[in-house]
């Protein structure tokens, strides 16, 4: 029996993450709470190519992997625990086309965990109206991942996203942070001074 494919939808608040979740799962979803806390847990099933089914988790909105709220702690604890039954095979990071630069911090942090990741730039239907242009090929080169322009309103990018999820093993898992060029002594001294802070 093949391992269940688990997909985590991650993003800043108000990036349209729940719309992508609804597009993927339709009515095959349920809402509960994480054990012992009142943070909402949304999950569903998505039917992919070749009869593959994916377990989709719509994680609480978070700005970074430096937790400042209970919601953000849920996201971090899951992504740092490979033994968690819900640890994702692939992370789908949802960004807002109008706030892409801010959203990229979270994406790079997740990618640096070596989790296969895809960047979804949501609300692409407003690009023309707002005079925004994005060269996805340049972004893909710099981020080392697949980038999808997505519009829930127009259902644009949904089939591409499903295809990438199905073939997630082809995604690169290289880190955005070049650890080979870091002054390790500098970061070790910072870690002693700020033991509770991440490298970011």
Residue spans for each PLM region:
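Catalytic cores of large soluble enzymes that bind and process phosphate-bearing ligands
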Residues: 31, 67, 98, 131, ...
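Conserved nucleotide-binding/hydrolysis micro-motifs of P-loop NTPases
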Residues: 36, 61-64, 97-100, 123-128, ...
């Amino acid at each position: 029996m093949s391992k269940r494919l688990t997909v985590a939808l991650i993003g800043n608040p108000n990036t349209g993450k729940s719309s992508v979740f609804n597009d993927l799962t339709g009515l095959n979803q349920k809402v509960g709470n994480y054990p012992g806390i009142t943070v909402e847990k949304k999950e569903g099933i998505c039917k992919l190519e070749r009869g593959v089914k994916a377990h989709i988790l719509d994680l609480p909105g978070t700005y970074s992997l430096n937790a400042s709220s209970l919601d953000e702690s849920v996201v971090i604890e899951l992504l740092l625990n490979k033994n968690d039954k819900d640890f994702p095979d692939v992370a789908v990071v949802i960004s807002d086309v109008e706030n892409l630069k801010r959203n990229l911090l979270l994406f790079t942090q997740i990618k640096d965990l070596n989790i296969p990741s895809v960047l979804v730039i949501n609300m692409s239907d407003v690009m023309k109206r707002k005079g925004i242009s994005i060269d996805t090929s340049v972004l893909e080169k710099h981020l080392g991942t697949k980038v999808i322009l997505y519009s829930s309103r127009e259902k644009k990018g949904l089939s591409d996203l499903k295809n990438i999820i199905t073939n997630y093993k082809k995604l690169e898992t290289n880190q955005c942070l070049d650890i080979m060029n870091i002054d390790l002594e500098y970061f070790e001294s910072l870690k002693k001074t700020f033991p509770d802070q991440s490298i970011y």
